[in-house]
Amino acid sequence: MRLSKTTSFIVWILLLPGLAVLSSCSTKKNTLVRRAYHNLTAHYNVYWNGMDNLRQGVKESQAELKDNYAMVLPVFNYGDKTSATKLSQYADIGIKKASKTINKHSMVFNRKEYCKWIDDAYLLIGKSYFYKQDYPMARRTFEFVIKTYNQSEIKYDAMLWQARSNIQIGDFNRAEPMLDMLQSKIRKGDAPARYETELNLVYAQFYILQKDYAGAVPFLNRALELKPSSAMRTRCKFILAQIHQLNGETDEASRLYTEVIKHAKS
């Protein structure tokens, strides 16, 4: 059974007295009680503190960003260095919380990690560096996740973020094989289909930042078929309208612009 966030928080509060007693639990012994304690506290350190903090920072940053409508929009707008500087205070907390989670709660026995949130903590560190626009550190972190947790689905998240990092610094030769590999795994059923929406959006970003707008079109259309968020659907339609307009396909451009306007009014 999946608990709601509110219910989970209540459970967490009720468990606090017992956790205070367990707070001295060592990560050196592999027992059920120690695993339960470190998994529970790691979960809330990562998601309720670090991850939620980063999400809040990204949300505030996105609200302040301005798009340049004189150009074909990117799928993802991460802002400039000024935006990254403002976001850094949130990203730094994400890095701090995730690092604390790893240092205090990692339980490795016979080369197996028994705290299931450690890989998420590393991914959070990578995302935090990404939003700080420290792409070299982000790439190193995502590469570590891909290699270290290659038997876990989280490697697919890391592959997408690794590709995003390479795209942002213009290293398209490294981004493309990563995207192609994940696409192949999804088509073969080796990777979950839930990654396909984001994969198509990142592919579109890959082509748009190279000004290969024709290359982006099929990925934007496929992303729309997969029904991303409402805001992303509107953005994809607007980008497609811009591309059709550039190509002189005024009827299709007009149709898409009309859909965007209707959505904005609703």
Where is each model-derived feature located?
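Acidic, polar-rich low-complexity tracts and alpha-helical solenoid repeat scaffolds
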Residues: 3-6, 13, 21, 25-266
